Amino acid sequence: KMMNSELFVFLDDVQFRKKGWQNRNRIRTNKGTALLSVPVHAHLYPNINKIVIDNDKNWSSKHKKSILYNYTPAPYFEEFKNSIEVLFEKKFECLIDLNTEIIKFVMNELEIKPKIIFSSDLKISQNGSDKVLGICKALNADYYVTGTSWAKSHLKIEDFKKSNITVKFQEFQHPIYTQIHGKFIPKMSVIDLLFNHGKKGTKEILQNSIVTSS
């Protein structure tokens, strides 16, 4: 969605989801895949921007070693090796700060330049579709780019139309691409694409996998 937007809103004042993708992702390995999770203190599952990382566990060093070890054979390993090392050597107290840093890394590598805003800064009290509409209004948006799975069943499209905001549905058609370690396995972290196809190749593959409709 960032590739089709001028402004990206990080929805950080919504509830953290246990076993979701807010603190974990998958990478390719010579044995198949590995799930890398960032340990967090999430008692009662507060909002994402309140989640504190459990840095007593040596997760950062382990994840860095796992990524570098498994992607050493990749064609573009040397291009991204240093950036990965720098990213995982930084210390983060809150999950939101880590996720923001990762997003900025990807944006920089793919030369995607939307402005980033945190929903918590807008102080929109509504929930669900009303919250999204409130955010769009606060930012004077002309259109809103969203995925299809949640939006088509929960978004109140008529409310957006009344506010002269066009909703654009973006469907991601998962690409099949050349991947190290054997047969292709889908739903990996974007770093899998970067290591295998570089900046230019990753951007082209992603652009060709997006279908947008109103």
Positions of PLM-derived features:
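Residues lining hydrophobic/aromatic ligand-binding pockets adjacent to catalytic sites
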Residues: 1-214
